[in-house]
């Protein structure tokens, strides 16, 4: 049975990572990307299946029992491509190969907003290594190469070739995407979405590209509960931005696109040409600051779930931001009889 506060909403829009989907597979891919890239730059070949077997040991070493992930996320690193990239830059600056404790300490002493520090980091890295500054900059050749390696690990050989049209540089990667598990119990997630879909339009607004969204929700047999035109994802953002503007969260574009339908013209959304009355009966569910900021910019009610990277520590932030609801997880949407 659904909790009563949900009765007032006709549409529910879900962020995915930290809400339904876990970021664990992405962090695994980031660790393997760092490992492979550092080896590659020393001309040391890797064995992909062997790396998969030793994945937990590699991740523990690279991210210092995930402490490095937490520090970098707190300092504004939202993209997992950036997580891998900045870890390699810091490893080169610190001159480390196996012991990443120095990298963790370096990260702790960095600016509170690392997003403003990328160029300086690339410059320091250039001075330390002798590598070309332009090559080292974010979104330039080094970053692009690492992004490709990340996608190889995450998608696996078959999906990567289908998406990008060429064979991975190193084959034998089975794809971490296929190992994904929901952040709450699958049977509870299925029950929740089934009950919600009986009276509400369900949508997604996620930074994942379509293939990374559809694979897990298809595997978990929950895709059928969402509106066919309600799957807003990163592909829609790229198409709408056209290289001219930034429409990722905290911009409200993704939530608006999900609400009014992926066929609704982007220009009408961006020009404010839509029925605002629908927003009053829309609930946005997310786990991050960018989610609540986008919901507020849109004018929708917001429900925070504390299953993201910050966990229970995020409660104070969402209280200060005046979220309408703060729940431990999506399971709290249901009245579960024991």
Which residues does each PLM region occupy?
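Active-site neighborhood of HAD-like aspartate-dependent phosphohydrolases
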Residues: 2-64, 82-85
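Substrate-recognition "cap/lid" segment bordering the active-site pocket of phosphatases
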Residues: 176-184, 190, 203, 208-283, ...
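Non-catalytic, alpha-helical, charged scaffold/linker segments
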Residues: 41, 48-160
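Short, acidic loop-to-helix structural element flanking the phosphoryl-transfer center
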Residues: 2-3, 13, 131-134, 148, ...
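Short beta->alpha linker loops
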Residues: 25, 208-209, 250, 287, ...
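Short, charged/polar "capping" segments at the starts of alpha-helices
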Residues: 211-214, 310-315, 335
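Short acidic-hydrophobic, aromatic-tinged amphipathic segments that line or gate anion-handling sites
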Residues: 233, 324-333
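Acidic, Mg2+-coordinating phosphoryl-transfer loop and its flanking beta/alpha structural elements
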Residues: 283-325
